[in-house]
C-alpha cells in the first residue's frame, strides 16, 4: 500500500497571503508619502507598523515551519524555498520602510517626479506579488506575474537613472544629490525584491510540475 502524503499546512499559505497584503499596504503608504508631503508623519508611522507586521509574519512562518507553532500538515513546498520566500517578502517591506524613513531623516521638503513614478512601479509590482501568492493555493505557474514584474523592474531601472541624471543636470547641492540617490536606491531595491519573489515562485511552480 502506498504511503499517504500529509495534507498541506493551510496556515502557512494563509501567512504568505497575509504577507502579500502587507507588502501591498507598505507600497501604497510609501507612494502616498512621496505624493503628499504635508501628511508624511502619520503615513510614516503606518509604514513603520507595516514593517513590524512584516517581521511578525516572517517570525510566525519560520516558527511554524520549525514545528514551534500550530503547524498542521506538511509545508506547501520545500523548506528552503519557504525560508527564502519569507526573507525576500520581508525585504520588500524593509526597503519600503527604509525609503520612508530616509525622507524624514534627510528632511526632504519636495518630491521628485521620478521618485513618485518609481513608487507607482513598486505599487504595481507589489500587486503582482500579492496576486501570485494567492495563486499558491491553486498551483498557478506565475508566468504572467513574472513577465509583468520584470517589465516593471526595467521601468524602475529607467526611472532611477533618469532621476539621478536630473539631479546632476540641475546642479543642485551635492548633499541633496547624495540623499536622493540613497532614496532612489532603497526604492529600487524594493522593486528588485519583488522580482526576486517572482523568480522564487516560478521555481516553486516548476518543482511542482516535475512532481
Report residues per predicted region.
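Cytosolic, long alpha-helical scaffolding segments
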Residues: 1-211
